[in-house]
């Protein structure tokens, strides 16, 4: 029986969480320092909002994939343990 391999590496999982939190942090700094919004600041906010959106999507995907992988691995280990007991 082939062992199931996780879809996401630890590095990718950390990067997904980092991207989300970095976007939220940078957006918060920008809001704190915003007095009047000039054109370059509007571009900054658009870029950071895109970063937050991508980070949120990646974080959701990684969390869901990791949860599904844990279920699959647990089921596979259960089957493997049952086959060892039967033989």
Curated annotation (Swiss-Prot):
Membrane topology: Multi-pass membrane protein
InterPro entries, alphabetized: YiaA-like (IPR038972), YiaAB (IPR008024)
Residue ranges crossing the lipid bilayer per the database entry: 10-30, 43-63
GO annotation, cellular component aspect: plasma membrane
Subcellular location field: Cell membrane
One Pfam family this sequence matches: YiaAB
Keyword hit for Hydrolase: no
GO BP annotations, alphabetical order: DNA damage response
Keywords: Cell membrane, Membrane, Transmembrane, Transmembrane helix
Protein name in the entry: Uncharacterized membrane protein YubF
Organism: Bacillus subtilis (strain 168)
């Amino acid at each position: 029986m082939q062992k199931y391999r996780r879809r996401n590496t630890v590095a990718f999982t950390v990067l997904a969480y980092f991207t989300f939190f970095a976007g939220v942090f940078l957006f918060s700094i920008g809001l704190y320092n915003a007095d009047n919004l000039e054109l370059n600041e509007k571009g900054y906010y658009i870029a950071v909002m895109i970063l937050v959106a991508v980070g949120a999507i990646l974080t959701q995907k990684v969390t869901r994939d990791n949860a599904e992988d844990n279920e699959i691995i647990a089921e596979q280990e259960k089957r493997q343990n049952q086959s060892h007991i039967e033989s």
